[in-house]
């Protein structure tokens, strides 16, 4: 069904995410233990856009946990950090000072490309710190080497776990008092297409933080 105005554009979404434990220190097995209630509602489903991935988000004062679960994929993920547009990848945008009426990214906004496999790193998962168009300034140089990732291949898909330490997010130190973050993501798949969180790329979701979803941090 074609919509003149996408239904999800008619709502101001504020979703709650639970508090989680720190990531596992082990080098095998699950990196993150995601609590009940961490799976996000995907507003894009209201717009008849593709739906093939679950997105789970949780937090604690030391960082942010994100898990992407892709289903219905006919082959293993592929990709390279040298050509993100042609890769299986999840694009994340995070704002540690969401205002709701600011249309240009501030120094509190961050953008990461998270690859389940990177052929230039022995097919291990990888994160690439990305610029945001028209961003006013940055206060912290996020370093991908401090972001922990783990991929679990499954029949017909994969799980990608990402732990972003608060040290890599400007303004995260005060996040407990603020109680919310701005968040947006797009899951890009070479077989299944693109699944945005709310709106397709006809809208400026890649650089306008007022279009991102607010995540309320619960204890």
Briefly describe each language-model feature range:
Residues 1-219:
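Structural preference for beta-rich elements and adjacent junctions enriched in aromatics
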């Amino acid at each position: 069904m074609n919509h003149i105005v996408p239904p999800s554009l008619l709502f101001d979404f504020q979703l709650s995410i639970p508090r989680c434990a720190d990531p596992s220190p082990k080098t095998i097995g699950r990196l993150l233990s995601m609590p009940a209630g961490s799976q996000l509602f995907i507003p894009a489903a209201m717009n008849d856009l593709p739906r093939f991935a679950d997105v789970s988000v949780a937090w604690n004062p030391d960082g942010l946990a994100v898990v992407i679960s892709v289903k219905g994929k006919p082959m293993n993920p592929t990709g390279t950090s040298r050509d993100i547009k042609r890769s299986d990848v999840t694009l994340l945008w995070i704002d540690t000072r969401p205002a709701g009426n600011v249309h240009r990214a501030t120094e509190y906004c961050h953008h990461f490309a998270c690859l389940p496999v990177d052929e230039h790193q022995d097919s291990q998962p990888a994160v690439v710190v990305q610029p945001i168009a028209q961003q006013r300034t940055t206060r912290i140089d996020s370093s991908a080497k401090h972001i922990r990732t783990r991929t679990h291949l499954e029949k017909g898909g994969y799980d990608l776990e990402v732990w972003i330490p608060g040290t890599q997010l400007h303004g995260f130190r005060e996040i407990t008092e603020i109680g919310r973050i701005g968040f947006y993501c797009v899951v890009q798949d070479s077989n299944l297409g693109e699944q945005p969180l709310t709106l397709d790329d006809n809208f400026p979701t890649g650089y306008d933080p007022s279009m991102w979803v607010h995540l309320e941090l619960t204890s």
